[in-house]
Amino acid sequence: MAKKVQAYVKLQVAAGMANPSPPVGPALGQQGVNIMEFCKAFNAKTDSIEKGLPIPVVITVYSDRSFTFVTKTPPAAVLLKKAAGIKSGSGKPNKDKVGKVTSAQIREIAETKAADMTGASVDAMMRSIEGTARSMGLVVEG
């Protein structure tokens, strides 16, 4: 018989830096999950990813307090900021431009995000990421 799902917990945790402090501890503690077990498993799974990059994770908590988790790719905005070499996007994206990204960088980000975005072609994902870039005050070249 399959285990009964008790809850789904969605978090963004820095790669390789999960620890019992907020937001991880309180979110998992409410569900009765062994927090350190999750932290060790998450850090082991994300050790190949650049340390500190925020990784969305969906944790499935079962009624017997066991859990499984699925990691996603980093948010497009984070990858765009990294590609453009900026700390944050523009507060006024239509007026103040804060950086530039090339079409090649956009394609690379789209191919990275392809695992999470189902049913869309790379070109469609590129257009979506270009829109995100423009809304952050980045100029898309090429």
Curated annotation (Swiss-Prot):
Question: Does the keyword Ribonucleoprotein feature in the UniProt annotation?
Answer: yes
Keyword list, A-Z: Methylation, Ribonucleoprotein, Ribosomal protein, RNA-binding, rRNA-binding
Matching entries from InterPro entries are given as: Ribosomal_uL11, Ribosomal_uL11_bac-typ, Ribosomal_uL11_C, Ribosomal_uL11_C_sf, Ribosomal_uL11_CS, Ribosomal_uL11_N, Ribosomal_uL11_N_sf
Q: Which GO terms describe its biological process?
A: translation
Tree of life domain: Bacteria
Give me the segments passing through the membrane. none
Which CDD domains does this UniProt record tie to the protein? Ribosomal_L11 (cd00349)
* Entry annotated with the keyword rRNA-binding: yes
- Which GO cellular component does the record give, naming just one? cytosolic large ribosomal subunit
Q: Which family does it belong to?
A: Belongs to the universal ribosomal protein uL11 family.
Q: Pfam families in the record, alphabetically?
A: Ribosomal_L11, Ribosomal_L11_N
**Gene3D superfamilies attached to this UniProt entry:** Ribosomal protein L11, C-terminal domain (1.10.10.250), Ribosomal protein L11/L12, N-terminal domain (3.30.1550.10)
* MF terms (GO), sorted A to Z: large ribosomal subunit rRNA binding; structural constituent of ribosome
Function according to Swiss-Prot or TrEMBL = Forms part of the ribosomal stalk which helps the ribosome interact with GTP-bound translation factors.
Native source species: Photorhabdus laumondii subsp. laumondii (strain DSM 15139 / CIP 105565 / TT01) (Photorhabdus luminescens subsp. laumondii)
Q: What protein name does the entry list?
A: Large ribosomal subunit protein uL11
The record describes its post-translational modification as: One or more lysine residues are methylated.
Q: What does the record note on quaternary structure?
A: Part of the ribosomal stalk of the 50S ribosomal subunit. Interacts with L10 and the large rRNA to form the base of the stalk. L10 forms an elongated spine to which L12 dimers bind in a sequential fashion forming a multimeric L10(L12)X complex.
